[in-house]
């Protein structure tokens, strides 16, 4: 059984800060735990808009706090994200994630992240060796 507390993640290499300052990702489960997915708590900072395109991963997201929106590219279709809303990027959907107020999101990735991935210039988490 795997049990991790917030105190075991915050301030360690499992807490990743976006280079652009838009988000903080606390990675509780990673590929090395062998679960077949990774599990994260992600904080999206208020007033930010982030381009994301997970070409190599599927992601499901559940909002537990805050408010924002997902805007699909290129259609421009928008979805309100607030407490109690789940969205799943089941088609590797390219999108913008905007936060009108700070959001706290619970995220699951498949394949699992290895640990320190950040979005590249195209909004992608590159695959690492073994994925």
From Swiss-Prot:
GO terms for biological process: ectoine biosynthetic process. Keywords: Lyase. SUPFAM superfamilies: RmlC-like cupins. Signal peptide: none annotated. Its EC number is 4.2.1.108. InterPro entries: Ectoine_synth (IPR010462), RmlC-like_jellyroll (IPR014710), RmlC_Cupin_sf (IPR011051). This is L-ectoine synthase.
